[in-house]
């Protein structure tokens, strides 16, 4: 439950097309569906820290949320290519109403997120100190 330190690549943008029109960005954009989740199941090595179809048998972070936190969300490529169980999953750049600490993610206000989207591309990296 701690934000990892380092320099990391960013993944695609996932967004709620029912709430937000397609943002201006050079990132690949994927609409979030109700059946999307991000696997955080320590018993599921195959899918750990990956996008999955929601399955009640697999522990996951819901991508389709009632709050607006994941209306815009970019997975940060931490523990990503060959994820190690328990090292951390679902480390995201997402929306917040304020700048209070998160459980390991980076959260910014929607207006700031939209500005960032105009500036970043698939080669952009995030530095977390």
What does each model-found stretch correspond to?
Residues 1-103, 111-129:
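Cell wall/extracellular polymer interaction/catalysis modules
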Residues 108:
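A conserved hydrophobic position in a structured secondary element of the catalytic/binding core
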């Amino acid at each position: 439950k701690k934000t990892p330190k380092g320099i990391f690549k960013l993944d695609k943008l996932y967004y709620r097309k029912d709430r937000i029109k397609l943002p201006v960005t050079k990132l690949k954009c994927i609409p979030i569906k109700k059946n999307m989740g991000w696997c955080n199941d320590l018993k599921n090595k195959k899918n750990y820290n990956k996008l999955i179809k929601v399955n009640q048998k697999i522990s996951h972070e819901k991508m389709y949320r009632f709050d607006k936190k994941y209306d815009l969300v970019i997975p940060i490529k931490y523990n990503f290519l060959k994820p190690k169980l328990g090292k951390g999953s679902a480390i995201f750049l997402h929306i917040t109403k304020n700048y209070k600490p998160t459980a390991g993610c980076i959260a910014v206000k929607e207006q700031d997120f939209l500005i960032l989207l105009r500036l970043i591309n698939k080669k952009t990296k995030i530095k977390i100190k």
